[in-house]
Amino acid sequence: MLKSFRTEIHPTAEQKVRIHKTIGTCRFIYNFYLAHNKELYQNGEKFMSSSKFRVWLNHEYLPQHPEYLWIKEAYSKAVTQAVNHGQTAFKKFFNHESAFPKFKKKGRSDVKMYFVKNNPKDCRCERHRVNIPSLGWVRIKEKGYIPTTKEGYIIKSGHVSMKAGRYYVSALIEIPDNKTADLSNEGIGIDLGLKDFAIVSNGKTYKNINKSARLKKLEKRLVREQRCLSRKYENLKKGESTQRANIQKQKLKVQKLHHKIDNIRTDYINKTIAEIVKTKPSYITIEDLNVSGMMKNKHLSRAVASQKFYEFRIKLKAKSRENGIELRVADRWYPSSKICHCCGMIKKDLKLSDRIFRCHCGYVEDRDFNAALNLRGVKTYKIA
């Protein structure tokens, strides 16, 4: 089984320059590949695959344009992967899975430095450092997090990324499959919401982390820093003495706050999933939420986005598969909140403001807990 491990690294000043150059080259090549195929289409020529583009770039374009020879200074595997990502984006567009590929702008796009194991000396890992091709040994912040080479684990591939002035490495490692877990407990249903993050049918409720005092304080601070950044831009437009270096410093402050808030939410999701999986249920049932539709409501869009429902589903799916737990997904139109768990009657006039479910049979229960109980016993579902 292949598993990804992501942690922060502490590269030297020289390694940082190398990372910046490689990521910049990857972004340039990705944009160049999109622009070249766009030009071919406008001229009525055939689409150029990633392999043909690399041959054309190395044997035709670069010899005629020596000013772009700096492309060859970057790690070749990372550049190749950038072209492959461009081809994947085009394939998704051709298959009507996504929109037309967009160019990646400097500072606003998530571009990574890809690396792969070519020989036994590449991609070795020790407790406190990891060997990355073209960078050498790089120190790891969280010592012992990535399985080491001495323990028999092999890094197949990975990538280096940057976010808010911090550097991360993600390594793909082959680990042995876990033995079938003893799933002696009954299945559970999970209802996701905005008032509380998750309500489980076993009675456990996970609160909305966005309502905590810590996150509210950080969000207020973020508003102040964003206002300060906006004023600097306005002063620059008016021609007043605002240094561009100060704008970059303020922008980094805003990025770090965004990153910190995002990390708190992600950490809460990870801990919630770990606690749910530790109960060893025979199966877990969730509902197929229409998040994109919920985001269209201007009154709820911000609250929905901050809950990160999709990330919860993806990570729960991976953790369930790792522990041999069946993850069931109920139909999107299954009325889990409107069905009485006691008699099965559907209460069609239930409003979103009704937090207590009251049935004519005398059954009274919290709306979200009633939905979790219904999800636990749903008969029609898909296996995630």
Identify the residue ranges that each predicted region occupies:
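Well-ordered beta-strand positions in beta-sheet-rich domains
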Residues: 4-8, 137, 157, 187
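Acidic carboxylate diad motif detector
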Residues: 52-166
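Ordered, soluble secondary-structure elements with a strong preference for glycine-centered loop motifs
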Residues: 13, 17-20, 77-80, 200, ...
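Stable alpha-helical structural segments in soluble proteins, enriched in small hydrophobic residues
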Residues: 33, 78, 82-93, 367-379, ...
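Positively charged, helix-rich recognition surfaces that bind polyanionic ligands
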Residues: 3, 148-151, 163-384
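Gly/serine-rich nucleotide phosphate-binding loop at the start of the catalytic core
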Residues: 1-79
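Long, hydrophobic, amphipathic alpha-helical segments used as structural scaffolds
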Residues: 34-41, 90, 94-101, 175
